[in-house]
Structures are given as C-alpha cells and as structure tokens.
Amino acid sequence: MATVLIVGKPNVGKSTLFNKLVRKRKAIVEDEEGVTRDPVQDTVEWYGKTFRLVDTCGVFDNPQDVISKKMKEVTLNMIREADLVLFVVDGKNGITKEDESLADFLRKSGVDVILVANKTENQRRFEREIKPELYRLGFGDPIPVSAEHSINLDTLMEKIIQKLEEKGLDLETKPEITEAIKIAIVGRPNVGKSTLFNAILNKERALVSPIPGTTRDPVDDEVFIDGKKYIFVDTAGLRRKSRIEPKTVERYSTYRVVESIERADVAVIVLDATQGITRQDQRIAGLVERKGKASVVVFNKWDLVEHREKRYDEFTKLFREKLYFVDYSPLIFTSADKGWGVEKIIDAINLAYSSYTTKVPSSALNSALQKVLAFTNLPRGLKIFFGLQVDIKPPTFLFFVNNTEKIKEPQKVFLRRLIREYVFPFEGSPIFLKFKKSR
C-alpha cells in the first residue's frame, strides 16, 4: 500500500490535517509543541482509492533532549522510505528557519513533495503576503488549506491521488464480490421466460435447491452449474401460471419485473422474436438500465421466425435501434422449446457479471482520456481534468471538471464510449457517471 507522510515543524496543524483526512480523531491535537511523540497511521479511502497516511512528530531544527533527537531521527528515516510527503507549513504566519532546514533535507532526499499551507482561512492575506515567500522552499505552488475548518481538502486529496498514480502505484480498493450471481429472467407475458428457465436447468444439468421465501421475498432457486453457484430470483413467478384477470396481467407483471430486477445482479431480458421489440419490451429494458443492473438480451422463439438463417443481421440491427440504451448487452438467439442457443446464456451471464464487477486502473483511464481529449472539441468553457472509478455493481466513474453545468447528455455519451473503446469494454454492464467541480 502506498505511504503518504505528513511532516512539518511543531504546531503547524499536522495532526488536525491527519484526523480530517482519515475522517476520525486518532492523532492527539493540542496547541503545545511536540504533543505527537510516536508516528500515528491509518488507511485513507477516497472515491475507491486507498493509501496509508502517517502523522509524524514535529521536526525540531535543533532538538535539545534525547527523546526529541530520537523523534527527529525516526521522522527523517521515514521520509526516505515514503512514497509521498505532505510538507505542512504555517500559512498564517509564514515560514521560519526550521521550515527552510526541513525543505533542504526533503530536496536532498529526492522524495516527492506536496507543499501544504495550513491555517489559510484569510485567503486574501495568504495570497498577498505569505504565498510569495513559500516559493523559496522549492516545491512549486503550495496548496492552501484550513484543516480545522475542512477548507480545500478535496483539492489536496486530488493532488495526492494524482501524484501517487503518476508513480505507478496501485491505489485501487479491492472490491468485495458476492459468492453467487443473482439472476432475474424478465420480460413481458408469454415470451417464454418459464420455458427458458427450465431449458437452462435441463441443458446445463443443474442441481436446483429451492430457497424458501418469506412474506416479503419471493422464492429463489440456488442453482449449481459446473460447480459454480447461481441464484435465480423469484422462480415461483416463472413456474406458476397466472391466476390474474387478463386486464391486470400487464400491471401485475410489471410489478414483478421491478421487484425481480432490484434483487438481481444480472437481468436476462427475454423478447419474442416473432413479435419484434414492443414498447413494453423497451420499458422493461429501460428499467434494467436505470436500476444499474448488468444485462443479457435474448430473442426467444427463434425457431418460429421465417427465413431465420438470413435474418440475424436484421434482428441485430433492430436490437441496436430499439434497445440502444442497453446495446452493450450480449445478444443471443434461442428456442427454449427446442433447446437452441440455451447453452450460450450462462456464458453470457458470466461475461456480463465479470464486467459488472470489474474495476479499471485510474492510470489506464486517464491515459485514454488525455489521448482522446487531444483531438476532441469539448463545449466552450468545459475542461475535464481527470477521472477515476469509484464503485462496481454497476461500474461508476467520477470525473473532475471545471464546470458541472456544462456536462450534458452528449458529453456523457462521449465519456461512456471513451471508456468502452479505450479502457475496458464492460460488455453486458451499464456505466454510471458522476461529476465533481474542481479547480
């Protein structure tokens, strides 16, 4: 794990900064010099990125007692081994000989340094009186913050992540992935959902164990295929014939679809190939996408389509046009009655789930972003600085921009396409985007 060290002379607010960045009070904060005797460390997680943060004792220029000398020795050794150092100075009162002495050591050590000016609540005075003298330390532009009042800490975190990733360090938080894939087979009435479910079980020679439902949860089936566990949700709804009056069937089936989709990881969207794609099919597919679920699209009853051998391209085009919002989904042609193509469904589910739980390195994302932006005209006044993946299930990306109001649907389409074409295809999975204003 990457290690970031907070260093500085006593009483510049290192421990307060540490506590704010780790979001808990772990380092003792007092107004007396030398309160922090031993290094304190904790893990910082920020938008899916993780690193170790260490708060060191204040470095005295000329320590007088044995303990202070030992503290300084420990801190200087830790600096040599750190991946990045946050050099904290007093942005209210300016720098001293102690700061200059520590700056000299940091430059000679060759460690990467971010200069942090703390206590800059009076921003105007800082810019006018203090900031110019900080350039003497030799670390470029300082980042002004107020740890006590949590001012500008996001900017500092962005810089930390950027610096660490430039060094090629792995900051990704390892995702926790559930043991079994939860699958919902969804579609409008009479498209062959039940037949398809049973065909999967028969074709895959699956071992099935009903999981009893409660008053709130429908019955599920735990299915083992090639030693791998899958949970098909609401299989009771797939097995029993409807006892509901015809005029309420659509309303009831829509309710069941919503419930099943919410509980699933992957939705298998079943279409009737003899009827094409209807408005209700589009609504169901749209619901899957909005709920952030992975998906596989199945044209069932393919055996009943005339001249089917010559019509794969026609139906693929129909799928791309009418279900364009889930066109990342694997498309399969089946006949549940005859068992055609059924064996491909589990493979497609595995592919979609793998995409759904994939996390890509920020270095790959930002490398692609910079290359594509070099020949892309963004709306006037919009700048995209960098991005990172902050979640899975579904894959969610956060982009830092100068103006979030400039982000419209075309920019979202552009970024999703960039991710799929240049970073990772995420076949079968939606991609969610978030935006945050940054300077």
Swiss-Prot record:
Domain of life: Bacteria
Keywords: GTP-binding, Nucleotide-binding, Repeat, Ribosome biogenesis
A Pfam entry, by short name: MMR_HSR1
Residues reported in the UniProt entry to bind GTP 2: 187-194, 234-238, 300-303
GO molecular function term, any single one: GTP binding
PANTHER family membership: GTPASE DER
Designated name of the protein: GTPase Der
Species this protein is from: Thermotoga neapolitana (strain ATCC 49049 / DSM 4359 / NBRC 107923 / NS-E)
